[in-house]
Amino acid sequence: MQKNLQACFFAFGGIFEVSLACLTPTVNRLRRLSLLAHPRIQEKSLQKKLQACFFAFAFSYICNMNEFKSEIEVTADGSATLYRADIDEHYHSVKGALTESAHVYVNSALRYRASDGVSSNGLTLLEIGFGTGLNAAMSVEAVDVPVRYVSLELYPLSPQVVEQMGYDSILPYIGAVNAAQWNTPVAITPLFTLEKRIANFLSCDLPQGVDVVYFDAFAPEKQPEMWSRECFQRVYQAMNPGGVLTTYCAKGVVRRLLQDVGFTVQRIEGPVGGKREILRAIK
């Protein structure tokens, strides 16, 4: 998938360079005709607009490519999830998408950390895998303190796909979090700021001073590169002392890796009807 993504951008980049080459003679002719006499109207602005168009097209193509391989399925608690046929994996637990999100992340991480006292600056939360935006939507009003919510996602879904999942009837903020612009902070409420980043977790810069981590990547057998010692080390270094990380995956190898980088790891009860245990790691 990642190779396909890179190939797409290389292709778009090639088209973009050709388009700029075609555009330059036109800009020069217009300048000679004095149509570009105003100092603010330069070829750079036209190039930027053209570049923006190509990036928008690339982003749309990537979203559609991702969605083509996704099917909506209803989980045991009545809420929907997406199934990725290309990797044979669901975005949420088939035992209950809403149940998993509420228990594993909102209650066991965000509310747990908030109950331990929060400074006037509030909490910074890092999510690994924005997905459908379910975790973000359920976190908006989960605590009565300021929350800066930074979510990393390499393959974004379009809001139209999430609309088909029926979350809007039970989650008032699902539309807002999915419609929020990428790569810029957006105030969903006065206390909740969302920053969705199109980024590769393996190589991007992580926010610092993180208090809560939702580690919600696809399963280790599907994305082993996301569950390495190096990845957990990067997260650990980005967190404040007392920071809390939770994940649905309670495999022994994951627990040992978390411990190895410095976390104190707890095996706690899993969601009703779902996994027997989940992991909570504290720095």
Label every PLM stretch briefly.
Residues 229-241:
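A short glycine-rich, Lys/Arg-flanked "PGG" loop and its adjoining helix->strand segment in the class I
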Residues 242-249:
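Conserved beta-strand signature within the Rossmann-like core of class I S-adenosyl-L-methionine
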Residues 251-283:
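Class I S-adenosyl-L-methionine
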